[in-house]
Structures are given as structure tokens and as C-alpha cells.
């Protein structure tokens, strides 16, 4: 590893560790991840202790209005760099794990603790390990939407 690569890697890891514990789910935490190279849109919310791709943050895109829950993990590579995209107004629940080469569709919801190994269609709720679709979203789970309104507009998909 070159000296520049080592310094860049150290900077990335230091910023990652600060971001995990920093206050400001819509401000400082987001800014620190941007400094690391994560592509982050407007109005993004990143929860406490979320881990966003430790080695190649530039392979992660989080679009406008998306949220990443507390202690969620986003992995953009295993052996090959594949990337992860979280589309507009998508919500990744607490403790969820997003694996490489996955896109979380616009307005979709990944429930707490789910492991997502395949891309998720827009406006879909997924759950489990591996995550499977369980419902269609009627209104995205944005910060200004009540849980009551969100849940009333869900359409279950039936037996999984």
C-alpha cells in the first residue's frame, strides 16, 4: 500500500469512527460521511452507530430524503466492488444489513434487523434474513409522515 493510500485509509477510518458517535443525524453525522466520500443527497437522516462501508465509502449512494437506522450496516464490497444505492425516501431500519450490489428502491422500507441480499423494488417493505417483500408502501415513511398514516396505507402481499 502506498503512503497516500495509507493516509487516505486512516482518514476514512477516523472519520467513520467519529461519525458513528457524532451528534446530528441530519447534520454533523451526514457531513462526516460526505467527507469520507459517501454520496449523500439532501434531507438524509443517519442514525447513531450506523456503519457505512468502511473501505470504499465512494461506492455508497444515499439519495434525498432517505434514512439509515441506528446500528444499520451498509457493505458495498466483499471481494469485488459492487456498490449500494439507497433511493429517495427509502428507509433502512435499525440493525439492518445491506449487502453489496443492492439498490433499495424509492420509498421502500427495510425492517429492523433484516439482511438485504437482493435489490428491493420501489415502494416495497422487506423483512427477514434474507429479506423478502411483505407489503407495498402507500406513502413513503418520511420524517413528516406519522407511523399511523404509514401503516394505514400499507398493502400486505399475502403469504410469503
Question: For each of these PLM feature ranges, what is it?
Answer:
Residues 33-34, 38-40, 44-127, 131-133:
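Structural signal for interior beta-strand "rungs" in well-ordered beta-sheet cores
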